[in-house]
């Protein structure tokens, strides 16, 4: 087989995306990846996997807004009081 100069020997992109084999494979895999990603986030597994707090756990139930630290050098004790 003689290849053109500069050719890598790979199939042209247009030939790949117009093949039936490409669409049979991707008609299953692309929706499956989308559904898996949606379930990963929707079930909360993403929060557990990456260790981030869930949206409902940023504030305590009794609080209606974010806590404000008023003393720069006393911040740790202020936050400790908040969590008790």
UniProtKB/Swiss-Prot annotation:
| Keyword Metal-binding carried by entry | yes
Question: Which locations, inside or outside the cell, does it occupy?
Answer: Cellular thylakoid membrane
Q: Which GO terms describe its cellular component?
A: photosystem II; plasma membrane-derived thylakoid membrane
Query: Keywords in UniProt for this one?
Result: Electron transport, Heme, Iron, Membrane, Metal-binding, Photosynthesis, Photosystem II, Thylakoid, Transmembrane, Transmembrane helix, Transport
Q: What membrane topology is given?
A: Single-pass membrane protein
Q: Where, by residue number, does the polypeptide cross the bilayer?
A: 24-38
Q: Which GO terms describe its molecular function?
A: electron transfer activity; heme binding; iron ion binding
The cofactor(s) it depends on are: heme b
InterPro entries xrefs: PSII_cyt_b559_asu (IPR006217), PSII_cyt_b559_asu_sf (IPR037025), PSII_cyt_b559_N (IPR013081), PSII_cytb559_asu_lum (IPR013082)
| Cytoplasm as UniProt keyword | no
Which cysteines are cross-linked by disulfides? none
Q: How is the cofactor bound?
A: With its partner (PsbF) binds heme. PSII binds additional chlorophylls, carotenoids and specific lipids.
Residues making up the signal peptide according to the UniProt record: none
Q: Write out the residues that bind heme.
A: 26
A GO BP entry is:
photosynthetic electron transport chain
The record's section on Pfam families has: Cytochrom_B559, Cytochrom_B559a
Tell me which family the UniProt entry assigns to this protein.
Belongs to the PsbE/PsbF family.
> What is this protein's function per UniProt?
This b-type cytochrome is tightly associated with the reaction center of photosystem II (PSII). PSII is a light-driven water:plastoquinone oxidoreductase that uses light energy to abstract electrons from H(2)O, generating O(2) and a proton gradient subsequently used for ATP formation. It consists of a core antenna complex that captures photons, and an electron transfer chain that converts photonic excitation into a charge separation.
Q: Which HAMAP family match?
A: PSII_PsbE (MF_00642)
Assembly and binders: Heterodimer of an alpha subunit and a beta subunit. PSII is composed of 1 copy each of membrane proteins PsbA, PsbB, PsbC, PsbD, PsbE, PsbF, PsbH, PsbI, PsbJ, PsbK, PsbL, PsbM, PsbT, PsbX, PsbY, Psb30/Ycf12, peripheral proteins PsbO, CyanoQ (PsbQ), PsbU, PsbV and a large number of cofactors. It forms dimeric complexes.
Listed name of the protein:
Cytochrome b559 subunit alpha
| UniProt source species | Prochlorococcus marinus subsp. pastoris (strain CCMP1986 / NIES-2087 / MED4)
Q: What is the lineage of its organism?
A: Bacteria, Bacillati, Cyanobacteriota, Cyanophyceae, Synechococcales
């Amino acid at each position: 087989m003689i290849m053109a100069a500069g050719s890598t020997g790979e199939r042209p992109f247009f030939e790949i995306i117009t093949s039936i084999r490409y669409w049979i494979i991707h008609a299953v895999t692309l929706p499956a990846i989308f559904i898996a990603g949606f379930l990963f986030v929707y079930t909360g597994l993403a929060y557990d996997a990456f260790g981030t707090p869930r949206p409902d756990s940023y504030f305590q139930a009794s609080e209606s807004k974010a806590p404000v630290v008023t003393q720069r050098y006393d911040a740790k004790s202020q936050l400790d009081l908040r969590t008790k």
